[in-house]
Amino acid sequence: MRSHYCGELNASNISQEITLCGWVHRRRDHGGVIFLDVRDREGITQVVFDPDRAESFALADSVRNEFVVKLKGLVRARPEGTVNPNMNTGEIEVLGTELEILNAAKTPPFQLDEHQSVGEDVRLKNRFIDLRRPEIQQKMRFRSKVTSVLRRYLDGNGFLDIETPILTRATPEGARDYLVPSRTQQGSFFALPQSPQLFKQLLMVSGFDRYYQIAKCFRDEDLRADRQPEFTQVDIETSFMSEQEIMAMTEEMIVGLFKELMDIDLGTFPRMPYSEAMETYGSDKPDLRIPLTIVTVSDLMAGVDFKVFSGPATDPKGRVAALKVPGGNALTRKQIDDYTKFVSIYGAKGLAYIKVNDKSNLEEGLQSPIVKFLPVEVRAALLERLEAEDGDLIFFGADSAKIVNEALGALRCKLGDDLNLYTCKWAPLWVVDFPMFEETSDGGITAIHHPFTAPSCSPENLKASPLTALSQAYDMVLNGTELGGGSIRIHQSSMQETVFELLNITKEEQEEKFGFLLDALKFGAPPHGGLAFGLDRLVMLMTGSSSIRDVIAFPKTQSATCLLTQAPGEVSEKQLKELNIRIRKPVVES
């Protein structure tokens, strides 16, 4: 139907007769001449209709925004003074000779260039119109390029694209499963996969050596700006490769991706132990663009006559830490109060601070409600350790180590954003040497990653001291966002059973939920490992989007609903009866 895309035309097409198809982006009537900006996925072309061609002129006069049209015309240079340098097609225009309306359109609920004044709920309800916006179309096209580059790299390195089941069984992987009732096995349920984890391990046992998949995954959890109930990951697994080899290969893949699509050189990724990340940045995904660091001062505060500090300082599970903000004296009392409210989200009971007005005067040069509780020698040691200068502000966290890390880690990132402290645009790294387990609130233990991650020690040492054992896990982090996480997997059944036992999974549960895996590990499972990248988050970062909803064609809301299709929805009594399911209405208390 067409000879060219709208956005393809340029000065090289001058004097050519062309045919275009697309949507009317804008219609203008200038002194008896009608201008139509016609849009398709490649861009916009200006088309001119003059009264000399009465039939096409009359049609052009009748069209409105978002009409679908087909037109023929002659490409010509724009008159002097009308060139638009902001458009790819800004040097030319098309003199329209024929026009056909392929479909009329109702007035859209919002104009494409006015989307910022429209609520997101309106845009998502009319997503088929929202997706016409050039900005969103560019992001969708960029996403397609990302998957194309990644596929090419993996194909070129001997990986096989193999699909794994979507209907599987529920396994404990950290989040709630989406369940699908079985009609043929009444009373039983499938689960949608949270990841292809077990199947890709079985593919390694089967001898496929290198596997990848652009996989849909599902998790029924509370949503944030970077989470969706269904999401896409680039899933990778390989046999006979070490932790270092897997990291080097996937780093090369991401470096190549950024270079090819954005001409950005990410360089070599530094590697940081988990303990250092938590101690210095309060996060296992530190944003290294921000130069602020967290410094432990528990030893300085252990003997002070201030229980808010001395209590956590002497508690084996507590921590007192400081965060220096260079030039932070300029922060107002209201700003400090706002930051105090912010850290309360993470369980902090308050946010102590000291303003350094004159570091040479330890008696009167420090401004703070808490400074009176700190002996002069503690003040001096504190300023020396933090390398504080006049004009700096020091925030403190004092609580359990977990709360201090989370609160000051989040505050560090918020300060970096609020005060624009970024020192570079891109800061990748690997976080390594994760603990195998962490303690739960009820005194039990849970896997930091998942129960199939291999430890760095023997089963005997793991049993003897599970909370000090390290895992062979690694996370790729970019700008404070986890791009991908992976590990070497357990490939021996005895080790897998040991991990299950430590997680208090009984023999019966092991057999019921993981019997197929334990059996497979007894039939010659090779050493193997892998990694999964969050595709949505990767594209979000690369396109500078604030939410992954901007890089997914049909996203869900933060309440896990689709405003376009009104999913999830009720089903008929007939369907429920076929599944032998009865809906129990919630009891409303009067």
UniProtKB/Swiss-Prot annotation:
* A single cellular component GO annotation: cytoplasm
Q: Where is this site: Important for tRNA non-discrimination?
A: 30, 81
Q: What UniProt keywords apply to this chain's record, in alphabetical order? A: Aminoacyl-tRNA synthetase, ATP-binding, Cytoplasm, Ligase, Nucleotide-binding, Protein biosynthesis
Q: Where is L-aspartate bound in this sequence?
A: 173, 219, 449, 489
GO terms (molecular function) for this protein are: aspartate-tRNA ligase activity; aspartate-tRNA(Asn) ligase activity; ATP binding; nucleic acid binding
Protein task: Aspartyl-tRNA synthetase with relaxed tRNA specificity since it is able to aspartylate not only its cognate tRNA(Asp) but also tRNA(Asn). Reaction proceeds in two steps: L-aspartate is first activated by ATP to form Asp-AMP and then transferred to the acceptor end of tRNA(Asp/Asn).
Q: How does it assemble?
A: Homodimer.
Name of protein: Aspartate--tRNA(Asp/Asn) ligase
What are the leading ranks of the lineage?
Bacteria, Pseudomonadati, Pseudomonadota, Gammaproteobacteria, Oceanospirillales
Q: Which gene encodes it?
A: aspS
